[in-house]
């Protein structure tokens, strides 16, 4: 299971109802923060999430409404007692930006591991301490370059699901019971001249959980295959109606209907709209424009929580 907490759902500048762009994923007690706009810490405090267990911060791009809360978050994480390394993932130039922002937080009690503009999937395993970058992990993060006014990337977060234990296969291979547990968790066993592998005791692959996060971009075609069959597609809806399509094109953002079209073409399960323009006081009033195209469309609210479970 993975919990999705919307910390900030506004774009451009905060409003009385909405902090700026931020999202928190909780997987087995380890947390991933996606963007940290103004108000992120306050939302986390109100939601009582804690700060120490944030293992990864993913930045979509370096406009202020997505990153201005970054130095404060780093400082608070340090004050919470964290000493394990913290991974930062971001677009081209994120290393330079992080170095600039951390001038005001120079004495952090933990190491920053920066991954700039990753070109391949990143694999993480849950350990006793944190999410650790290593091959064969149960959590995958991959990115897609978007079309915005500065380098910007989308994210997929995929939780792999382990195949079921197949007792019949284990018996047919005459595998000693004492090795069944180790084989289930992926270990190979050498015993009395034979090699036992996990495939000898496991069934078919099972569908995991996929969450896609796309914001601050025009609706480019590459997004469709990137979000394909996502369980949750979180997408910007800076403008409510297509009356503002010229503004959307000029500023490289999207309308509700454009986001819904991507959701429909990507065959996702549900669309959650976020990153609402400052003039859109009640985004729910425009939800019909999205639902005409994609029925399972919803509007995010600050501190709204969604939980996704395996089918």
From Swiss-Prot:
Cofactor info, note text: Binds 2 Zn(2+) ions.
Enzyme class: hydrolase
Binding site for Zn(2+) 1: 61, 63, 148, 216
SUPFAM superfamilies attached to this UniProt entry: Metallo-hydrolase/oxidoreductase
A Pfam family the protein falls into: Lactamase_B
CDD domains linked to this entry: RNaseZ_ZiPD-like_MBL-fold
Similarity-based family: Belongs to the RNase Z family.
Name by which UniProt lists this protein: Ribonuclease Z
Native species: Clostridium novyi (strain NT)
């Amino acid at each position: 299971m993975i919990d999705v907490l919307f910390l900030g759902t506004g774009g451009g500048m905060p409003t009385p109802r909405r902090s700026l762009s931020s999202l928190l994923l909780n997987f087995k007690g380890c947390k991933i923060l996606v963007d940290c706009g103004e108000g992120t810490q306050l939302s986390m405090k109100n939601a009582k999430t804690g700060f120490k267990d944030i293992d990864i911060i993913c930045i979509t791009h370096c406009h202020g409404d997505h990153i201005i809360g970054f130095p404060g978050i780093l400082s608070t994480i340090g004050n919470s007692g964290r000493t394990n390394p913290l991974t930062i993932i971001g677009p081209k130039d994120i290393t330079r930006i992080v170095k600039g922002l951390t001038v005001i937080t120079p004495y952090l009690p933990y190491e920053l591991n920066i991954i700039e503009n990753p070109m391949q999937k990143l694999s993480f395993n849950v350990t006793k301490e944190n999410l650790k970058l290593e091959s064969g992990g149960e959590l995958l993060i991959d990115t897609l370059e978007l079309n915005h006014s500065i380098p910007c990337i989308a994210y997929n977060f995929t939780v792999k699901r382990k195949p079921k234990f197949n007792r019949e296969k284990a018996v047919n291979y005459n595998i000693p019971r004492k090795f069944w547990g180790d084989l289930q968790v992926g270990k190979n066993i050498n015993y009395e001249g034979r090699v036992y592998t996990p495939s000898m005791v496991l069934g078919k692959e099972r569908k995991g959980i996929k969450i896609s996060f796309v914001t601050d971009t025009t609706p480019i075609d590459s997004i469709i295959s990137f979000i394909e069959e996502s369980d949750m597609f979180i997408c910007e809806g800076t403008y409510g109606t297509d009356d503002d399509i010229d503004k959307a094109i000029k500023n490289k953002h999207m309308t509700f209907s454009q986001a819904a079209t991507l959701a429909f073409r990507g065959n996702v399960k549900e669309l959650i709209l976020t990153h609402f323009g400052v003039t859109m006081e009640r985004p729910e009033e425009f939800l019909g424009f999205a639902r005409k195209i994609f029925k399972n469309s919803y509007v995010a609210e600050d501190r709204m929580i969604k939980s996704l479970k395996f089918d």
